[in-house]
């Protein structure tokens, strides 16, 4: 928007130059893209009177003028303008004057043998017209000679080209910019007074068919209208704003649009069809010739103004040619309305027709200022066109909104990094037009109508305070030194588990958390993305097998992978998540292993991988035969138990499932409860044991035992009885067959003893004998050594 510096100073007092004001507005969020300082355009140009004007003796189209500029000495000026004559007052640029528009500095010259000491200026040379046919002649009968022409031509002004953001519709008006300047400078705001006449109701009728698209519509009939040129001051302000003056009626509507941001439209009342003025969407097949002479086919998306059901204007965008105000107009109907931004945006976009009115309606116009802007227009029409308001009709569906937003000074200080006194916060908001009720902990801030479009939350008010106070006030500060960060215990253990899995040769993968509905207690989605993936997974193994299947089809073997993720389970209390660690291992020999160095991957190799992952936590895990999972081999599956609670499952893929999935039978999987593992690690006390520099002593122990007894049971008993000298125990051998009693197997264990001194044979024998006796008593083993 082009903002006149002088016009702005009528509404708010401030003591800044145009450049200083531009800097303040830019820092407050209203970027001033350019300052057009017109005061330099006619610097040194003065009022002069042409006393004599004679033809040039050497040129037919030139005149030799004698000009008085009040210095006591007449200037001899050669001029080629056809309208130069004696007795006129004109702008004169004496020798030494610089005209920036033409980049011309006047020097004394000789033109066709006649001396010339300056120039009689046209408006083109002063930057006020693109092309001029002659010099500018002041209409006044008498003017002081030597007077600066700047104030006479409106060149004592500066134009600020202000760019506003899309959420600040109020900034597309002089009143809106004046409010901002008053808040930024602390100046006194003096908005134009409105002394509009009271207009009675009467025969005129208005009806809104689409209240959502048009909340309020007011039509005012004015008579005794004298259409003609607008006053010079009004025309000058429109020209500075980039608008072309047309006539006093249209110019007044444009002036109010610039002043208040409220678009208005005037219809020739005698050219309107009889009937009610209405607002509705277009019917299919309707057409309208707009003011630019273009016939436009309408669609049901176009909002219209109608008279007697005939379209007369494209609402909020452009009026119709048939009801245009012209020189013969004596009665007008003045429209003032609020339109829904999306409705106007659609019409403007469809017809590629962006007008000053549509630009404001698209952003949202202040509905609370409608009557004020209309009153201002009626006042100016009475002054500039002699119009008399006769009757008025209004259809109003507006919902009066009283928005109150809470603002906490403590939160403001937290966001901005600086404590601002409560009194200053209140002053800034009041200067912006907000009503502020202060409290001990927070302010209750009532949002004015012109800011309802962009002030909705507390953070919006904080932004207002920050930009008015000035962003440069908040000095950059380094944050205080922070303590060293650390991961939550759960994240630390999870990262450690991932690292251990990678160290064991497993590759991390991520599978879908959605799965087919094939479990016994699935968590079925009410609105799934697909019928195939309609529930949440209850285990990780199914997804890992699909990953293995895909990679095997691509030739990516051997394949050893793991996943850390959550599964979704049901209980009596509802649905809950559980963290899990799952893995799949398929050890087919790699392609190119001609020496057969890669051993086949068996159950014990898979168990070794799992043991390597669990070993750092020093958790005693009991492996029990398990047949419950139908996906796994019934004779090669074990459940993992710790202190009587299930930790997970390790097993080989069932041959039938392996065949169905086209996978090798030597495929092994495990899944453990990661949440349970984290709890075990958390509860386990950290104990320090110093390394013993003394030599160990190894003893072997073999015996026959019933097949029903597990190795874990023997290892657990050996550890219990071997304390505190026993360092480790490991299975050396297992044998079944000839020489072994029926229903039994031969087991051999190696036990390593160590202490903080060199063990004697007596110490070792005593502990070793205690272990032998405990095995015989508890499990009735037949000791062989």
Swiss-Prot record:
Ranges where the FDX-ACB domain occurs: 692-784
EC number, UniProt record: 6.1.1.20
GO biological process, one term: phenylalanyl-tRNA aminoacylation
Main location class: cytoplasm
Molecular function terms from GO: ATP binding; magnesium ion binding; phenylalanine-tRNA ligase activity; tRNA binding
B5 domain boundaries: 400-476
Catalyzed reactions: tRNA(Phe) + L-phenylalanine + ATP = L-phenylalanyl-tRNA(Phe) + AMP + diphosphate + H(+)
Keyword match Nucleus: no
Class of enzymatic activity (EC top level): ligase
Keywords (A to Z) from UniProt: Aminoacyl-tRNA synthetase, ATP-binding, Cytoplasm, Ligase, Magnesium, Metal-binding, Nucleotide-binding, Protein biosynthesis, RNA-binding, tRNA-binding
Cofactor: how and how many bound: Binds 2 magnesium ions per tetramer.
Residues binding Mg(2+): 454, 460, 463-464
Stretches assigned to the tRNA-binding domain: 39-150
Subcellular localization: Cytoplasm
Cofactor(s), by name: Mg(2+)
InterPro entries: aa-tRNA-synth_II/BPL/LPL, B3/B4_tRNA-bd, DNA-bd_dom_put_sf, Fdx_antiC-bd, Fdx_antiC-bd_sf, NA-bd_OB-fold, Phe-tRNA-ligase_IIc_bsu, Phe-tRNA-ligase_IIc_bsu_bact
SMART domains xref list: B3_4, B5, FDX-ACB
GO cellular component annotations of the record: phenylalanine-tRNA ligase complex
Family recorded in the similarity comment: Belongs to the phenylalanyl-tRNA synthetase beta subunit family. Type 1 subfamily.
Oligomer status and interactors: Tetramer of two alpha and two beta subunits.
NCBIfam families: pheT_bact (TIGR00472), YtpR (NF045760)
Protein name: Phenylalanine--tRNA ligase beta subunit
Lineage of the species this protein comes from: Bacteria, Bacillati, Cyanobacteriota, Cyanophyceae, Gloeobacterales
């Amino acid at each position: 928007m082009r903002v006149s510096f002088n016009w702005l100073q009528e509404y708010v007092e401030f003591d800044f130059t145009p450049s200083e004001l531009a800097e303040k507005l830019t820092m407050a969020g209203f970027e001033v893209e350019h300052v057009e300082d017109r005061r330099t355009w006619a610097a040194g140009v003065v009022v002069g009177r042409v006393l004599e004007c004679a033809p040039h003796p050497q040129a037919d189209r030139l005149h030799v003028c004698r000009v008085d500029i009040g210095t006591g000495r007449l200037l001899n000026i050669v001029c080629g303008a056809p309208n130069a004559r004696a007795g006129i007052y004109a702008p004169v640029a004496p020798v030494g004057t610089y005209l920036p528009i033409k980049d011309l500095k006047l020097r004394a010259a000789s033109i066709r043998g006649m001396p010339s000491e300056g120039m009689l200026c046209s408006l083109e040379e002063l930057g006020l017209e693109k092309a001029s046919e002659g010099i500018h002649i002041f209409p006044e009968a008498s003017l002081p000679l030597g007077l600066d022409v700047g104030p006479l031509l409106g060149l004592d002004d500066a134009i600020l080209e202000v760019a506003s953001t899309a959420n600040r519709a109020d900034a597309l008006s002089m009143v809106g910019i004046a409010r901002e300047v008053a808040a930024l400078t602390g100046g006194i705001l003096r908005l134009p007074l409105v002394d509009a006449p009271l207009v009675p109701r009467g025969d005129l009728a208005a009806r809104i068919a689409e209240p959502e698209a048009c909340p309020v519509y007011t039509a005012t009939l004015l008579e005794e209208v004298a259409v003609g040129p607008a006053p010079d001051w009004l025309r000058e302000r429109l020209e500075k704003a980039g608008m072309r003056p047309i006539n006093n009626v249209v110019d007044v509507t444009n002036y109010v649009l610039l002043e208040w941001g409220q678009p208005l439209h005037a219809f020739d009342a005698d050219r309107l069809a009889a009937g009610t003025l209405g607002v509705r969407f277009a019917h299919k097949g309707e057409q309208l010739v707009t003011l630019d002479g273009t016939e436009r086919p309408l669609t049901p998306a176009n909002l219209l103004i109608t008279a007697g059901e005939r379209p007369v204007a494209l609402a909020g965008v452009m009026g119709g040619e048939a009801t245009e105000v012209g020189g013969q107009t004596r009665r007008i109907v003045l429209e003032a309305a609020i339109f829904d931004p999306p409705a106007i945006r659609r019409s403007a976009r469809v017809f590629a027709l962006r007008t000053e009115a549509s630009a404001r309606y698209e952003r949202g116009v202040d509905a609370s200022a409608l009557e004020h802007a209309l009153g201002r227009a009626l006042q100016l029409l009475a002054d500039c066109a002699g119009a008399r308001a006769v009757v008025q009709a209004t259809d109003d569906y507006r919902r009066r909104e009283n928005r109150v937003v809470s603002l906490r000074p403590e939160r403001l200080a937290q966001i901005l990094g600086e404590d601002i006194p409560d009194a200053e916060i209140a002053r800034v908001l009041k200067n912006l037009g907000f009503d502020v009720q202060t409290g001990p902990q927070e302010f209750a801030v009532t949002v004015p109508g012109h800011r309802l479009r962009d002030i909705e939350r507390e953070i919006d008010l904080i932004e207002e305070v920050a930009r008015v106070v000035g962003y440069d006030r908040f000095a950059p500060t380094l944050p205080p030194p922070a303590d060293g960060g650390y991961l939550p215990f759960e994240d630390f253990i999870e990262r450690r588990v991932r690292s251990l899995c990678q160290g064991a040769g497993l590759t991390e993968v991520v599978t879908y958390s959605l799965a087919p509905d094939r479990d016994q207690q699935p968590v079925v989605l009410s609105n799934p993305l697909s019928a195939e993936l309609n529930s949440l997974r209850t285990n990780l193994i199914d997804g890992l097998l699909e990953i293995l299947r895909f990679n095997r089809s691509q030739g990516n073997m051997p394949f050893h992978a793991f996943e850390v993720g959550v599964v979704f389970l049901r209980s009596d209390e509802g649905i809950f998540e559980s963290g899990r660690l799952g893995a799949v291992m398929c050890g087919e020999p790699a392609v190119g292993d001609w020496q057969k160095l890669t051993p086949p991957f068996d159950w014990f190799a898979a168990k070794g991988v799992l043991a390597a992952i669990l070993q750092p936590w020093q958790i005693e895990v009991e492996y029990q035969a398990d047949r419950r999972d139908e996906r796994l081999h019934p004779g090669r599956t074990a459940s993992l138990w710790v202190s009587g609670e299930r930790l997970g499952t390790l097993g080989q893929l069932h041959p039938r499932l392996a065949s169905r999935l086209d996978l090798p039978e030597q495929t092994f999987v495990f899944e453990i409860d990661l949440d349970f593992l984290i709890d075990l690690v958390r509860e386990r006390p950290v104990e320090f044991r110093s390394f013993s520099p003394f030599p160990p002593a190894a003893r072997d122990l073999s015996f026959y035992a019933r097949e029903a007894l597990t190795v874990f049971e023997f290892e657990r008993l050996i550890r219990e009885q071997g304390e505190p000298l026993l360092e480790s125990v490991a299975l050396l051998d297992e044998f079944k067959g000839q020489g072994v009693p029926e229903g039994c197997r031969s087991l051999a264990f190696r036990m390593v003893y160590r202490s903080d001194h060199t063990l004697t044979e007596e110490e070792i024998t005593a502990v070793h004998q205690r272990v032998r006796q405990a095995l015989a008593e508890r499990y009735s083993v037949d000791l062989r050594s």
